[in-house]
Amino acid sequence: MKTFQDYYPDELAHCHGCGRLNEKGLHIRTFWEGEESVTRFTPAPHHTAIPGFVNGGILASLIDCHSTGTAAAAAYRAEGRGMDTLPMHRLVTASLRVDYLKPTPLGPELVVRGRAKEIKGRKVVVESAISAGGEVTVRGEVVAVELPESMIPRAHA
């Protein structure tokens, strides 16, 4: 199954969190499961904050990249078209809020689930949550906006 990130053009696939071409990145992979977007990610030992727990910056990156991918996919879905069609929707973070509800254990697979809460013009608001072992440990909200034309490589402008 193709994930949202598979549709990012190579020129826009270098993000540390979601860029499939960033060899040292997290390589998150997001897909639809009904009306929710889902990412599954197993943190590595080098994602440690203190022994046994995931670093908060890694968790914020998961919320961030999961949510911007969800925002793009939701924009396509709202227009009734596939992610392989033009014009391209590629959204970036305008605002990121992360609430750490409890320490997130290192070891189990983390599941990130999200929903587009609002789609209005160039802006999509996404709510996401991370759970470990079925327990929500982090909640977040991202306001994502269409990538400014000045940042789009010429081949895709």
Label each residue range with its predicted role.
Residues M1-I50:
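Non-catalytic linker/capping segments at the edges of enzyme domains
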Residues V38-A74:
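A conserved, well-ordered hydrophobic junction motif at loop->secondary-structure transitions
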